[in-house]
Structure formats: structure tokens, C-alpha cells
Amino acid sequence: MLKVSKRYYGFQSKSPFQLLPDFRLKCGLEIHTQLNTKFKLFSFSTNDPFHSIDSPNSNVSFFDAALPGTQPILNYEAVIDAIKLSLALNCDINANSQFDRKHYFYGDQPLGYQITQHYSPISSNGKLSLFENIDNIDQSQKDIGIIQLQIEQDTGKSMYDDSKHFTRIDLNRSNVPLIEMVTKPDFTDLKQVRSFIKKYQNLVRHLKISSGDLETGAMRVDVNLSINDYARVELKNLPNTSSIVNAIKYEYNRQVEIIKNGSADELLTSPETRSWTGVKTVKLRSKETTIDYRYLPDPELPRVILDNDVITNISNSIPTLPDELLSRLISKPYNLSMKDAKILVLNSNGQNEMYTQEELQNFYLKVFDCYYNVVGEKLNHKLPVNWIIHELIGSLNKLELPLSKVLPKLSPEKFSEFIVLIHNKEISNTSAKLLLFHVLNQIKENDHSIREINFDSLIEEFELKPATNASKVDLTELCQTIITELNNEKLLNDIISGKKKNSIQYLVGLGMRASQGTLSPQSLEETFKKILQVKW
């Protein structure tokens, strides 16, 4: 009989993942975020590491390449971005920070050291709060502590060619400004980790300091975790959120198995760094082989000293933060669902090229205010958001027409007039959709005949006004004709019995089509129910 021994480093569980009460997860994150400044951190090279991928070493200054005699010149745009993020994370700003040298040798780090902020970082002692209704965590609120934020250089990029046994070095990324953010080990489940990463991504995008993309490397996450206060394990090589979550699951199960089998004192007492392969974690190094980085203050860079008015001015420039915007939109007078509010506020960065998040958000707020000023407390809260998110944006996508090109002719004030017409039932939803698409198509084709959009005139021109004076006899005859020509006894019986109540909307749709959208869906539904003698 073949006996296979267990190998803890290759442990995999086929059962659904769960955190066990006797094995407490303790987890923290280190997140490196590339800043989208115009220039690099300590040189005047263009900061464009992604668009220059096909042109290696094209954005490299003498300092980036560490040529002898070159000296760093601090890009203060990176400092401003770091202060913005620090304030958004409720950190204490260090008014007298410094840069330090972290010494190590690697091919893509030509200086022989990285300039960072080890001893006196730009900020510390902050927090980012997660909420049940916003972030879909299991607790009503969970505060994740921020130990510190520090400004530092990114490295170059190494590309290995195993077949030719050499390495190519691209220094376009060298000296790109980074913010390293280190959290406290406050995460106790995977939902919190996933939600925090998503929230942090949206925050840096909202502040316009980074794209926050994990896939491109603009944001890179390392995980520190331990179980039951055993030694900390650092996980690296985590290119996206699913990798982060799967690596934590695997490492948790691996360590639980070690503890259960009584090998914790042998295998979990020394801190170590492990890499995620996509399937499992593998050991890179242990504490005994940890590099001595020989930190020391950089003698070529002065301390960064901030006056109080600098911090105040930067604070005043920060836009309203996402959580505050969401809370505002789900409250009176907007009363949006959290789902709709998130569409307006949260920036996925997989953004449709037809609009920016800020454009969409501002457009909605102005449309709503104009609509509310006209109809007052009689407003339909869903009307503006539905017509903007679904109909307007849907049509823009279909026509490949940017919102910015539409705004000069279809301003929020003008669009609110359109919403008021729908509110007052001066045009049916079906006709309104056709009219909106027509107007947008004319704008796309640069039809100069549309100098100013007049929805009332267009409704008159295309005879889109609802047939409010249609007699009950005409309406009954139309509905009876539709039922007769449909000749579908099973469908009618399902409607009458209540087995398929929603099927009556199919009849309403036929009525709307036959009347070219001039009859109201409500009157059609009432008439169909009366003819069919529906009791429900």
C-alpha cells in the first residue's frame, strides 16, 4: 500500500473556505500606490510608466539611471498628493518629515538604495472606516487603523529571458513616486480585506492621485497574516483582488493544518515571506535571512517642513469624500437606493469613455435640483436617476457619444425640463425614450438645425403627446382587437388565473406599440384587466 506523507507547504482543501473560531485570523495590508504626477519623484522625467511599455528606457533621466554626480530634486506634487490621502485617511500629518536611504543591490535599482521615509514618514495614526450598508461587511462598522503613509521611489522593471540567460532592465518605472500605506493587523475576515481594498482604490481615484489599478501595478498589495498570535507571514506577488483573497484562504488553511498536526512550534515560530504562485504559497525567505537595509537619512535631500496654512489649503481643496456623498444621496431629498448612489459615486476605473464619474455625478445633482424646484414635494425620486443612468447613459454608449459633447446643448437645466414633461405625463415613457435618442443622435451628427432644444416643440412636431382624449370605446376596441388577434388562450388563462400576472405587461406593450406610445400604460392595463375580468 502506497503511503503519501503530508507536506504542509502544499496543503489544499477541497471543502468550502471558512474561518474557524479556534483559529483566529489576524491580518494587515501594505499597499504601494503609484502617484499620477506629471514628473517623477526626484527628477524631471515624464511620469508615464504604462504608456511607455513599448519604448523601454525612453523616460529616463541621468538621476533615474544613477549616473555619478546627479542629485535628487523633490517633486512637491507628490508631497501634496500624499497630504491629500493622509487627510482623507484621518492621519496625523508630520510637519517635519525626512527622506532616508534603504540600501540593497538589485539590477532594477541602479542607485544601490531606495529613497523612502523610514524614520520620519509624512503621516501616521489614521484610519479608514468600513460600514455594513456601504461596504457589505458583516459588522455595522469596522475601523481599520493606518500605521503610517510614506513617500518613496518605485524601482525599474526586470524582464527575464530564460532561453538566453539574461535579464533586460527597463528604467521607465524607476523613480516613479509611490505612497506606501501600512495598516494595523485589524482585519479579521475576508470581506473586510476585499472591501478595504475596493474602498481604498476608489478613494485614490476620487482624489485623482492614482489610477489605483492592481492589474497594471499602479497599486500593489502585500498581506501580513498570522493565526493565534504565531509568527507573522508576509504574502507577496498578489496581482489582483482574487489573488489576494485566494492567497489568504490558502495560507490560513495551511497554517491551521500545521497547528492541528502539532507542528506549529517547528514551522510557525519565525516570521517568513512567501510568494503566491496562483495555486499555493511558497517560501521566499525567513527572518534569519532578512536583509539588513542599513537605513540612514539621505544627506542630499532637506527635510520636508510644512506650514499650517499649507495643510489647511490642501484640506480645503479635497472634494467631498465618497462616504459622505453616499450618505447624502440615500437621504432626503434624493432618497436613492444604495445601488444607484454607488453608480454615481464609486469610480471603478473600468470607466465608460463616454463620461467621467465627476461629470455624471454633477449632472445628476443639477438635474435633480432643477426638477425639485419645479415639482417640489410631488417629485418622483427615481425619475431623474433612472433616466440619467439607464436611458441617457445607455443612449450615449450606443451612439458612442461623450457626455461632454452633449452638455453644451443638453444642459442639466434642459434635461430637467424633459424630466418634468415625463413627470407631468405630457409624454409617455416609450415616446420619451425615442425622443431622447433622436435628440442625442442629432447632436452627434452636428445637426446645426438644433440651436436650442425645445422638447415641447419636438413633442408637437412628432405628435408624441399622449392621447388623453381617447374615448373609452376606442380604448376598449383597441384592447379587444389585440386580444382577438393574439389568439393565445393559454397566455390569457395564465393572466386571468394569476399564474403569470406579469404577462399582462406583454399585452400592454402590444397596446403601446399599436398606439405608437400615445396611450398610457396604466389605462391600457386597466382596460385589459376589465375585458379579461381579472380579479387579482
UniProtKB/Swiss-Prot annotation:
It holds the Pfam family GatB_Yqey. It catalyses: L-glutamyl-tRNA(Gln) + L-glutamine + ATP + H2O = L-glutaminyl-tRNA(Gln) + L-glutamate + ADP + phosphate + H(+). GO terms for cellular component: glutamyl-tRNA(Gln) amidotransferase complex; mitochondrion. Keywords: ATP-binding, Ligase, Mitochondrion, Nucleotide-binding, Protein biosynthesis. It is an enzyme of class 6 (ligase). Its EC number is 6.3.5.-. It is found in: Mitochondrion. It comes from the Eukaryota. GO terms for molecular function: ATP binding; glutaminyl-tRNA synthase (glutamine-hydrolyzing) activity. Disulfide bonds: none annotated. The keyword ATP-binding applies. The keyword ATP-binding applies. One of its GO terms (biological process) is mitochondrial translation. NCBIfam families: gatB, PRK05477.1-2. Allows the formation of correctly charged Gln-tRNA(Gln) through the transamidation of misacylated Glu-tRNA(Gln) in the mitochondria. The reaction takes place in the presence of glutamine and ATP through an activated gamma-phospho-Glu-tRNA(Gln). Belongs to the GatB/GatE family. GatB subfamily. Subunit of the heterotrimeric GatFAB amidotransferase (AdT) complex, composed of A, B and F subunits. This protein may be expected to contain an N-terminal transit peptide but none has been predicted. PANTHER family: GLUTAMYL-TRNA GLN AMIDOTRANSFERASE SUBUNIT B MITOCHONDRIAL AND PROKARYOTIC PET112-RELATED (PTHR11659), GLUTAMYL-TRNA(GLN) AMIDOTRANSFERASE SUBUNIT B, MITOCHONDRIAL (PTHR11659:SF0). This is Glutamyl-tRNA(Gln) amidotransferase subunit B, mitochondrial. The gene is PET112.
